[in-house]
Amino acid sequence: PYEKIGAELVKEVAKKTDDVAGDGTTTATVLAQALVREGLRNVAAGANPLGLKRGIEKAVEKITETLLKSAKEVETKDQIAATAAISAGDLQIGELIAEAMDKVGNEGVITVEESQTFGL
């Protein structure tokens, strides 16, 4: 039963990450698994579960604060293309994404579907 609870927790973490960020599910899953593994190890060694939870919450606050301080706004078409190219691992895809975003604007929606056609 504990394994099922853990699996459900990791699924929820991945889903929430995808809903909020649209990316990062693998990283979130690895982090969740590490938190559960190390948390259980510490509790088994005698750590207070509530103290452990509070420590994790403080660490999350500090990490979030640090990430927000170092975050950079992506505003220009060139910045969007560069960011998208890194994410996609392909300069041409980055350019296409930037072009699509330029056309639909900040409030627009871009839908990507798999195709049986070869090429872009």
UniProtKB/Swiss-Prot annotation:
Show the GO cellular component annotation of the record. cytoplasm
The question of whether Secreted is a record keyword is answered with no
* Sites where the protein binds ATP: 23-27
Which residues, by range, are in coiled-coil regions?
none
Query: Where, per UniProt, does this protein localize?
Result: Cytoplasm
The broad enzyme category this protein falls into is isomerase
Q: Which reaction does it catalyse?
A: ATP + H2O + a folded polypeptide = ADP + phosphate + an unfolded polypeptide
A single Gene Ontology MF term assigned here is: isomerase activity
UniProt entry keywords in alphabetical sequence:
ATP-binding, Chaperone, Cytoplasm, Isomerase, Nucleotide-binding, Stress response
Family to which this protein belongs = Belongs to the chaperonin (HSP60) family.
Subunit-structure text: Forms a cylinder of 14 subunits composed of two heptameric rings stacked back-to-back. Interacts with the co-chaperonin GroES.
- The name of this protein is Chaperonin GroEL
Q: Which organism is it from?
A: Mycolicibacterium pulveris (Mycobacterium pulveris)
